[in-house]
Amino acid sequence: MTTLDHVIATHQSEWVSFNEEPPFPAHSQGGTEEHLPGLSSSPDQSESSSGENHVVDGGSQDHSHSEQDDSSEKMGLISEAASPPGSPEQPPPDLASAISNWVQFEDDTPWASTSPPHQETAETALPLTMPCWTCPSFDSLGRCPLTSESSWTTHSEDTSSPSFGCSYTDLQLINAEEQTSGQASGADSTDNSSSLQEDEEVEMEAISWQASSPAMNGHPAPPVTSARFPSWVTFDDNEVSCPLPPVTSPLKPNTPPSASVIPDVPYNSMGSFKKRDRPKSTLMNFSKVQKLDISSLNRTPSVTEASPWRATNPFLNETLQDVQPSPINPFSAFFEEQERRSQNSSISSTTGKSQRDSLIVIYQDAISFDDSSKTQSHSDAVEKLKQLQIDDPDHFGSATLPDDDPVAWIELDAHPPGSARSQPRDGWPMMLRIPEKKNIMSSRHWGPIFVKLTDTGYLQLYYEQGLEKPFREFKLEICHEISEPRLQNYDENGRIHSLRIDRVTYKEKKKYQPKPAVAHTAEREQVIKLGTTNYDDFLSFIHAVQDRLMDLPVLSMDLSTVGLNYLEEEITVDVRDEFSGIVSKGDNQILQHHVLTRIHILSFLSGLAECRLGLNDILVKGNEIVLRQDIMPTTTTKWIKLHECRFHGCVDEDVFHNSRVILFNPLDACRFELMRFRTVFAEKTLPFTLRTATSVNGAEVEVQSWLRMSTGFSANRDPLTQVPCENVMIRYPVPSEWVKNFRRESVLGEKSLKAKVNRGASFGSTSVSGSEPVMRVTLGTAKYEHAFNSIVWRINRLPDKNSASGHPHCFFCHLELGSDREVPSRFANHVNVEFSMPTTSASKASVRSISVEDKTDVRKWVNYSAHYSYQVALGSIWLMLPTPFVHPTTLPLLFLLAMLTMFAW
């Protein structure tokens, strides 16, 4: 490796070729070795290889332990390639031919004290046969040295190895200071083992540094050059570093020194190099660095003093410190400032662009630029960023929440499922419990009647439909409540749906066991008890009574309760969602749905108290003003839209339309419906999926259902917080002709067949047709119920505690009819599903605040519940095969094949 230990500079940057092998001639353009008598290698100077092989003088003292063993082999190989034997000596060329050239020494390490140079290097040098800027060290045969010869004139292709070219006057100053800096530089040279490191990076700002810049981080700033190492050069981090030889720039051979883009080195800086960090990388990524200060390359460096280099923050703009963020577009102020600055500096930007293009030409062989940014102008990108707007995802009609937009459900909700039940009717055929009150001496039974409900709130009872005068009539009051529906024994066929209308009064009572407490208990007095075997009539009557109770006018306040003081004041809010819909048979997609939310209030407040109720209404988002103690905890962050709101008579509707706050004077010790409204279903799927298939083969009918929990439902995602479905009912409608096949005789009369877990339905006797139906379930029970005219598959809790949430459950029924004539031409093509879920909400409606005027110690409670009732389409598979040609053992296989082809989990 050629080092700077034996460098001999020429006068006015003449070309000098240095060769450390005395037996062979070398090219030179001048013999001015006497100007640098002290630039020879010292015994303490260590030598290192940077990927080039150089000849080491046989008489010089070299104590470097990295090149001592192979120096003899390098001398023999390179000397033979540098000068072939028998080449005649030629006189040196004229010195005037290279007077405008610069001698550049590619070395960023300190120069150490050197030993006397070899005089025979210049005396035996061969002249150049052909001038070449990129490869001036031609031998006598006119060929460029090979890559293995590593002449000092070989240009470098590494853009990250900075170097400086030293003039003749610079070398004289170095000779004067070499006595003081030789010791330190010789010791520090071992730290710079290579100018190419694989695990580090070269900062881009190094190109714009001046030579006179002070040390950064305790190390001197490296000089800058445009010289580049060839791509074949490899570096070993374990080698010992040594100064690099001077390298010429291959760009502009005819450019005078004054026009060069490489700044001169100050006279007082070349001899005082100190230890610096290793360069980090050979490849520079221009896309990750700051802009180059091109103007600094053409500036004449100051000899006396230089401004220190400081690292600036590229993201800090001092002119924008007082600019406040814009609520519309936070980037507008920045873009306006940038445009103003760009207009003021249009001339300087043009000059900088031309200089930047020149650098791109310099490094285009080593760096590839991405031109994709040129396809779009800067002004277009700025305009697009200016048009950015921060949208509220919960804004009415926002595209981010299509489920909240009621426009998307207008067609589906035009005739919502279950709307026929709430339509006004002339009356309902019902059953009356006679006698109305229990009596030990007599039994009670059900008697048929006809019930009417007037607009004024009167309930009229008739013996038969069509009579003019009712036998009994009573008025509905605000203290009346409807009991929970239940099933009660009716006759030998089954049970009946029953309900009560009670007069309820709440009283405050003290309890001492197990600890003193105050409770508000309800005392119920039955007014009437009605029942029916028609489930649709039963639901329609309940909805009609609920609507009439809500529309009752609020009479004057009872003065007897105004002065009543409660020991504990409390208010309870019950939020109940009622979901009804139609679900497809294949993928269980919701085709139609209707969600009705009812809010009931029960309060025990002393005196006349005005209350405010706040919901998660989208129209009040960001405008809520409530006290801290009035905020109620919620489990949802969703905002909903309220549609078709209806209020009780105690609510001030004008205040609601103006501020969307529900202001009301609650009824004292009375549970009443405060308001109701419609919303959009907040989930994508239902809690579980149900798929049902039917196979009819002559006189044999098979029905099978698969039930599985849905992972898309929000309450099923976390097994630890999963909310179960309670009182699950799956009803399969049965034609009246098939009812006899689900009954069996017993000691007390006929009973319905019942299937339980791991036990199929057993039959005590054969039916009329001589065949027996079979029912099997993997969870819950299944039996025919006359109250629903259906086979009801009941499950108390879903998912089951003893099974995984994703485990499917199955219902199977096999019915053998007397003949295929018993198969009706058409029957129900859907399955009814009904269940309840506590502590959940189908509409995601939540109470955000409850405020009571002038009261802070009121206990507040909020309860949530949801009731689901929907229909699932029944998938029918008809296999009309001749009965004599089908063996009974093949029916399960045919049914299984049909199921697999139609349903896939």
UniProtKB/Swiss-Prot annotation:
Positions where Phosphothreonine occurs in the chain: T255
| Subcellular locations according to the entry | Cytoplasm; Membrane; Synapse, Synaptosome
Q: Which residue intervals are annotated with compositional bias (Pro residues) in the record?
A: 85-94, 244-256
The record places domain SHD at 427-560
Q: Its domain of life?
A: Eukaryota
**GO BP annotations listed:** clathrin-dependent endocytosis; regulation of endocytosis; synaptic vesicle endocytosis
Cysteine pairs forming cystine bridges in this chain are none
Query: Gene of origin?
Result: STON2
* Domain free text: The Asn-Pro-Phe (NPF) motifs, which are found in proteins involved in the endocytic pathway, mediate the interaction with the EH domain of SYT1, SYT2, EPS15, EPS15R and ITSN1.
The Swiss-Prot or TrEMBL record describes its family as follows: Belongs to the Stoned B family.
Q: Which residues carry this modification: Phosphoserine?
A: S281, S287, S302, S762
- Which PROSITE patterns does this one have? MHD (PS51072), SHD (PS51070)
Q: Which GO MF term does the entry hold, naming one?
A: clathrin adaptor activity
The MHD domain is annotated at 568-878
**UniProt protein name:** Stonin-2
The record's section on InterPro entries has:
Adaptor_comp_med_subunit, AP2_Mu_C_sf, MHD, SHD_dom, STON2_MHD, Stonin, Stonin2_N
Q: Where is this motif: NPF 2?
A: 329-331
Q: What is the lineage of its organism?
A: Eukaryota, Metazoa, Chordata, Craniata, Vertebrata
Q: Where is this region: Disordered?
A: 1-121, 178-205, 244-263
